[in-house]
């Protein structure tokens, strides 16, 4: 008789399948942090120009079961099975974005605006090629050739600036730089430029020197969609953008062109060149946002964004601050704080302490370091989504000025609580839809 074998111990273990518990029950730490962020958004005034409030429908799409689906490739040419539903969604979002902007071809897979720009670089440039873009110090973007960015490391980056008096793009300088350096790629667009860009003149300069013209409309795409800012699509060889900011969609990017050859190269550069599987839950949310932007009321929203920003900028100027370029044509304004003797980083911290969020920002030819700055950037896309109008933005300007005066006088500790009460009262009068 062989040795006895002890029976296997019986262990009671949890079901190894995926949990059906909601977030609060499953992960209190994450749920608590999200709840705190919901409170912050609900009770504060958002002036960050690159932020917005999406609709409940956009949130629902992004939080859907599409999170589970892999879909490498493009509609009807995938490397995975089970893609019929995501193919339908991606077909829809491409059709909608082309309808929205009057373009012939679109790639909606870039995970961000930066990756949309990288897709253009990979598709149309070779390492060492020359690119010409707006200087970061004049309101440009990191991805337009800043030395700390891959665009400034992989390519020979040259910049143009703004007129030192008007703070508007110096188109004569653009032409001079283009003739001297003969860039392969000429870039128009930026992250802190408040004026309308002359796309026709950029097209002329690009044609003169044989450059490809790329327009990065990440900041003003929603204004283009709403008909209150000129469209770059008829002028540019390729257009990139984010889907958030003024477009009021999820965080992501896209690329547009009317050139079939460029479109093919952009597709190959995006996948497999830069990315693997697309984020289909985000792409679904993009479809929802583009559908919303196609509605007539979105034009009224875009118009209100611009009008509100002009009111805000003028009220700040009336209070003694300087608005670079003398005003704004879009959703953002850059404010020079030097008349108050306050730096951008101090202003950002002080305003956040009373419930107003914005960002420190360099002014043209700023003498301060990037983490200090002489200015702040303000925007009206988010507040306008909330329902703020001209009266509210005049009040907000007053709260900003009151806070900065308190900083200068050293009385913020005493004044801050009352300012925050005013902020919370105003925010409560215009609740978020979720």
UniProtKB/Swiss-Prot annotation:
One Gene Ontology biological process: tetrahydrofolate interconversion
Coiled-coil regions listed in the entry: none
Documented EC number(s): 2.1.2.1
Protein name: Serine hydroxymethyltransferase 2
GO molecular function terms noted in the UniProt entry: glycine hydroxymethyltransferase activity; pyridoxal phosphate binding
Record pathway: One-carbon metabolism; tetrahydrofolate interconversion; Amino-acid biosynthesis; glycine biosynthesis; glycine from L-serine: step 1/1
Record-stated family: Belongs to the SHMT family.
Swiss-Prot/TrEMBL catalytic activity: (6R)-5,10-methylene-5,6,7,8-tetrahydrofolate + glycine + H2O = (6S)-5,6,7,8-tetrahydrofolate + L-serine
Cofactor: pyridoxal 5'-phosphate
InterPro entries the UniProt entry points to: PyrdxlP-dep_Trfase, PyrdxlP-dep_Trfase_major, PyrdxlP-dep_Trfase_small, Ser_HO-MeTrfase, Ser_HO-MeTrfase-like, Ser_HO-MeTrfase_PLP_BS, SHMT-like_dom
Catalytic class of the enzyme: transferase
A cellular-component GO term for this protein: cytosol
The UniProt record lists the keyword ATP-binding: no
One of the Pfam families matching this protein, by short name: SHMT
Positions marked as site (Plays an important role in substrate specificity): 244
Keywords: Amino-acid biosynthesis, Cytoplasm, One-carbon metabolism, Pyridoxal phosphate, Transferase
Residues binding (6S)-5,6,7,8-tetrahydrofolate: 136, 140-142
Residues modified to N6-(pyridoxal phosphate)lysine: 245
Subunit: Homodimer.
Main subcellular location: cytoplasm
Keyword Transferase assigned: yes
Taxon lineage: Bacteria, Pseudomonadati, Pseudomonadota, Alphaproteobacteria, Hyphomicrobiales
């Amino acid at each position: 008789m062989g040795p006895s074998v002890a029976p296997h111990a019986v262990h009671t273990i949890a079901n190894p399948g995926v949990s059906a518990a909601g977030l609060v029950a499953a992960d209190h730490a994450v749920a608590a942090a999200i709840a705190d962020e919901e409170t912050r958004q609900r009770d504060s005034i958002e002036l960050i120009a690159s932020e917005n409030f999406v609709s409940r429908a956009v949130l629902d799409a992004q939080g859907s079961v599409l999170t589970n689906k892999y879909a490498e490739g493009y509609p009807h040419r995938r490397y995975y099975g089970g893609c019929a539903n995501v193919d339908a969604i991606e077909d829809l979002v491409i059709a909608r974005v082309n309808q929205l902007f009057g373009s012939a071809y679109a790639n909606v897979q870039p995970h961000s605006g930066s990756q949309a720009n990288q897709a253009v670089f990979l598709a149309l440039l070779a390492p060492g090629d020359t690119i010409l873009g707006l200087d970061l110090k004049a309101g440009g973007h990191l991805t337009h050739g800043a030395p700390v960015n891959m665009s400034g490391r992989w390519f020979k980056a040259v910049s143009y600036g703004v007129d030192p008096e008007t703070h508007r793009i110096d188109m004569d300088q653009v032409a001079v730089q283009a003739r001297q350096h003969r860039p392969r790629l000429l870039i128009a667009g930026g992250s802190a430029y408040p004026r309308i860009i002359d796309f026709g003149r950029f097209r002329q300069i690009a044609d003169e020197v044989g450059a490809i013209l790329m327009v990065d409309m990440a900041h003003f795409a929603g204004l283009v969609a709403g008909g209150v800012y000129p469209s770059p699509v008829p002028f540019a060889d390729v257009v990139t953008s984010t889907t958030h900011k003024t477009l009021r969609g999820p965080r992501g990017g896209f690329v547009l062109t009317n050139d079939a050859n460029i479109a093919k190269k952009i597709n190959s550069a995006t996948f497999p060149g830069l990315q693997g599987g697309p984020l289909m839950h985000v792409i679904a949310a993009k479809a929802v946002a583009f559908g919303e932007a196609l509605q007539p009321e979105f034009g009224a929203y875009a118009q209100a964004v611009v009008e509100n920003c002009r009111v805000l900028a003028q009220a700040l100027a009336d209070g003694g601050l300087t608005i670079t370029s003398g005003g704004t044509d879009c959703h953002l304004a850059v404010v020079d704080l030097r008349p108050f003797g306050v730096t951008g980083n101090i202003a950002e911290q002080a305003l956040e302490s009373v419930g107003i969020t914005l960002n420190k920002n360099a002014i043209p030819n700023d003498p301060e370091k990037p983490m200090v700055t002489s200015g702040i950037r303000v925007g009206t896309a988010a507040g306008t989504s909330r329902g703020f109008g001209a009266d509210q933005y005049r009040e907000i300007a007053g709260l900003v000025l009151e806070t900065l005066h308190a900083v200068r006088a050293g009385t913020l500790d005493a004044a801050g609580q009352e300012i925050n009460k005013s902020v919370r009262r105003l925010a409560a009068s215009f609740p978020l839809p979720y």
